[in-house]
């Protein structure tokens, strides 16, 4: 009986077709940086040197993934509230807060948004693009930002190249959309959207008392 059991065990171990449970199969990990920093470029900070690198665009797009959605510049439309909520969540992460907006890998976000008392401030990294390559437009309450540069010789044209498109939906009666200012300098786009004052928002007209 013992010899027959040992023989059966040898046959099992020598078999080349042993079924492996799904739970034990190796799963290829997804790099966190590719999910959290899907922009035209990310900046690596090493010894105080600012270096530009193109990021990996092959990002997993599982439905409902908040972080990949909010950081993807090719998402059709994102709301301002989503962007501000994301910034609040990031600021609560000790490591990110300590590195001033950089993740554990030392990579800075490709965009930033700050809401102050008087205006909304946007910063978007668009490396390789000049002021002439960037166009901003307002479609009802949606701010549309487009950038497209000429492809240099030897540059891969099969991907997105130097193209950037983003649509940010602004809430109604909060910002002075007719006073939006934009500045493009050194591959960085800065947009300032003034806020409507509280009394202007509520159509309040103050009357002087003689």
UniProtKB/Swiss-Prot annotation:
CDD domains: ACD_sHsps-like
Transit peptide boundaries: 1-20
InterPro entries xref list: A-crystallin/Hsp20_dom, HSP14.7/HSP23.5/HSP23.6-like, HSP20-like_chaperone
Major subcellular site: mitochondrion
Pfam family for this entry, one: HSP20
This protein's UniProt keywords: Mitochondrion, Stress response, Transit peptide
Subcellular location, record wording: Mitochondrion
Domain sHSP: 102-210
Entry's Gene Ontology cellular component terms: mitochondrion
Gene3D superfamilies linked to this entry: 2.60.40.790
Subunit-level organization: May form oligomeric structures.
Family assignment from sequence similarity: Belongs to the small heat shock protein (HSP20) family.
Protein name per Swiss-Prot or TrEMBL: 23.5 kDa heat shock protein, mitochondrial
Species, as recorded: Arabidopsis thaliana
């Amino acid at each position: 009986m013992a010899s027959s059991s040992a023989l059966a065990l040898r046959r099992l171990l020598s078999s080349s077709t042993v079924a492996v449970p799904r739970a034990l199969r190796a799963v290829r990990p997804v790099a966190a940086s590719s999910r959290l920093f899907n922009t035209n470029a990310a900046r690596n900070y090493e010894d105080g040197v600012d270096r530009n690198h193109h990021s990996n665009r092959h990002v997993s797009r599982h439905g409902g993934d908040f972080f990949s959605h909010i950081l993807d510049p090719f998402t059709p439309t994102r709301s301002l509230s989503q962007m501000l909520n994301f910034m609040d969540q990031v600021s609560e992460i000790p490591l990110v807060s300590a590195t001033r907006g950089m993740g554990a890998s030392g990579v800075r976000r490709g965009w930033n948004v700050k809401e102050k008392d008087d205006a909304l401030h946007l910063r978007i990294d668009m490396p390789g693009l000049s002021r002439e390559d960037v166009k901003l437009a307002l479609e009802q309450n949606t701010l549309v930002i487009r950038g497209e540069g000429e492809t240099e010789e030897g540059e891969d044209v099969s991907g997105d190249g130097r193209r950037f498109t983003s649509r940010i939906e602004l809430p109604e009666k909060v910002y002075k959309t007719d006073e939006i200012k934009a500045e493009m300098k050194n591959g960085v786009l800065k947009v300032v959207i003034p806020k409507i004052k509280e009394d202007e928002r509520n159509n309040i007209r103050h009357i002087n008392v003689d």
